[in-house]
């Protein structure tokens, strides 16, 4: 049982790291930070705002793919060059940030 828990924790840490790496690779971190507002909102604030929303992953994945404006201030977020799977992966990761 202890080995299973260790493997599960290490596996989840790897997923979190991989998604942060994807965010860096795609340029997301140029405007966003995990905990502090930059040009765009902190990912922790995004996660808090959409916590409990049933369609949060799909909603955020759509915003990542298509861009958006007016939700977090006057600076629009341009559409991002990501696949549907990458957008969903990033959205799930963002929503996991505390």
Curated annotation (Swiss-Prot):
Domain of life per record: Bacteria
Role noted for this protein: Reacts with hydrogenase.
Name this polypeptide is given: Cytochrome c-552
Signal peptide: 1-18
Organism in which the protein naturally occurs: Hydrogenobacter thermophilus (strain DSM 6534 / IAM 12695 / TK-6)
Keywords for the protein's UniProt record, in alphabetical order: Electron transport, Heme, Iron, Metal-binding, Signal, Transport
Coiled coil: none
Family: Belongs to the cytochrome c family.
Gene3D superfamilies according to UniProt: Cytochrome c-like domain (1.10.760.10)
Any GO molecular function: heme binding
Binding residue positions for heme c: 28, 31-32, 77
Statement: the UniProt record of this protein carries the keyword Metal-binding: yes
A Pfam family this chain is assigned to: Cytochrom_C
Post-translational modification (record): Binds 1 heme c group covalently per subunit.
